[in-house]
Swiss-Prot record:
Name listed for the protein in its UniProt record: NADH-quinone oxidoreductase subunit D
Reaction(s) the record says it catalyses: a quinone + NADH + 5 H(+)(in) = a quinol + NAD(+) + 4 H(+)(out)
Protein family: Belongs to the complex I 49 kDa subunit family.
Protein encoded by which gene: nuoD
Compartments, record wording: Cell inner membrane
InterPro entries xrefs: NADH_Q_OxRdtase_suD (IPR001135), NADH_UbQ_OxRdtase_49kDa_CS (IPR014029), NDH1_su_D/H (IPR022885), NiFe-Hase_large (IPR029014)
Summary of subunit composition and partner proteins: NDH-1 is composed of 14 different subunits. Subunits NuoB, C, D, E, F, and G constitute the peripheral sector of the complex.
Length: 418
């Protein structure tokens, strides 16, 4: 009598290099074929929502950076828009353009990391090295406006922390760089920040082409991604997928176009949409999204160059007065003191505000009871819904394909576990 083989289970993660953080998955296998994939989450749970409810509206802002720690400023943007909607704050137009520009810089940062690490997980190492070279320059932009390369806390309810600087920090000589390399690195840093952005927008599309040369027609890359993790448009909508996970299946839905916020209605850009709903189509969507982000950044930079103005609301109940005003006006000094000791008071009400995050629809739901801190803060993380589709996407595939599916979902556990 032939022996019957039972399915066996293995642990994938949480210390697996392709688990994108602290993912633990229990995989039930029939030979090498996936029968069931059960993600175990919560290993990075820090109680962000509850922590934010114990802090003032301004103090809660830096928690947003630490949710999806690859797309920092877009998290801040969603939170600021929610507070502004509740408080009825008018954001100066220049601040809106700066926010949109940095939101698109963040989108490129995210997609470079997503595509680079996806390729690296599958076995192509060169892509991530090229991606990090470009990410380095974009993080220099973060550092120039906020002083931090990752957790910027640059956006504020009412605008942004400060205007764009009139210069870019330069690299200094060291024993690791000769004079020729130093000159090349500092070439685009001679002028203002907007000059640096223009130079980046000029050369970055060629760098995207280089990435495409490595992957798009690569036989091994296509074998590992075409037909893997297929999601139909109907199932994508039923599962609550958003962003590239939805557009890759052929559904043209982008919050920037369907429900425009800030100045996206003034921007000229296209929405890339997939056909087959597999890992390969989602990769192509991310590639094209980076090109569209460059278009938006260019439009914002051109507008900002010729339109000076304030970058934060003039209402001192929500934004601090200028330091020059505080030196002469008692009222301004009181406003400043009250704002940073007590915090802003937001009128009673509730709101749900969503933005087109690089990973999907990132939403912030706030209930205010009129106090200086949120009564309830709920975060709708796109990656949470995507991870719930893991079982359906992985079923019937080989064990090695799980890595490709995690990569295409672009999971970051800061936002999933919160």
């Amino acid at each position: 009598m032939a022996n019957k083989l039972r399915n066996y289970t293995i642990n994938f993660g949480p210390q697996h290099p392709a688990a994108h953080g602290v993912l633990r998955m229990i995989l039930e296998l029939d030979g090498e074929q996936i029968v069931r994939a059960d993600p175990h989450i919560g290993l990075l749970h820090r109680g962000t929502e509850k922590l934010a409810e114990t802090k003032t509206y301004l103090q809660a802002l830096p928690y947003m950076d630490r949710l999806d720690y690859v797309s920092m400023m877009v998290n801040e943007q969603a939170y600021c828009l929610a507070v502004e909607k509740l408080a009825g704050i008018d954001v100066p137009i220049r601040a809106q353009y700066i926010r949109v520009m940095f939101a698109e810089v963040t989108r490129i940062l995210n997609h470079l990391m997503g595509i680079g690490s996806h390729a690296f997980d599958i076995g192509a190492m060169t892509a991530i090295l090229y991606a990090f070279r470009d990410r380095e320059e974009l993080m220099d932009l973060y550092e120039a406006v906020s002083g931090a390369r990752m957790h910027a806390a640059y956006f504020r309810p009412g605008g942004v922390y400060r205007d764009l600087p009139g210069f870019m920090p330069k690299y200094e000589s060291s024993k690791f760089r000769n004079a020729k390399v130093l000159k090349q690195l500092n070439e685009s840093r001679e002028g203002t920040m907007l000059d640096f952005i223009d130079a980046f927008c000029e050369r970055f599309p060629k760098n995207i082409d280089t990435l495409e040369t490595l992957l798009t027609d690569n036989r091994i890359w296509k074998q590992r991604t075409v037909g893997i993790g297929v999601v139909s448009p109907e199932r994508a909508m039923q599962k609550g997928f958003t962003g590239v996970m939805l557009r890759g299946s052929g559904v043209e839905w982008d919050v920037r176009k369907t429900q425009p916020y800030e100045v996206y209605d003034k921007m000229d850009f296209d929405i890339p949409v997939g056909v087959n709903g597999d890992c390969y189509d989602r990769y192509l969507c991310r590639m094209e999204e980076m090109r569209q982000s460059v278009r938006i950044i260019k439009q914002c930079a051109d507008w900002l160059r010729v339109n000076p103005g304030p970058v934060i609301t003039a209402n001192h109940k929500f934004a601090p007065p200028k330091r020059t005003e505080m030196k002469t006006g008692m009222e301004d000094l009181i406003h400043h003191f009250k704002l940073f000791t007590e915090g802003m008071h937001v009128p009673e009400g509730e709101t749900y505000t969503a933005v087109e995050h690089p990973k999907g629809e990132f939403g912030v739901y706030i209930i205010s009871d009129g106090a200086n801190k949120p009564y309830r803060l709920k975060i709708r993380a796109p990656g949470f819904a995507h991870l719930q589709g893991m079982d359906e996407m992985a079923k019937g595939h080989m064990l090695a394909d799980v890595v490709a599916i995690i990569g295409t979902q672009d999971i970051v556990f800061g936002e999933v576990d919160r």
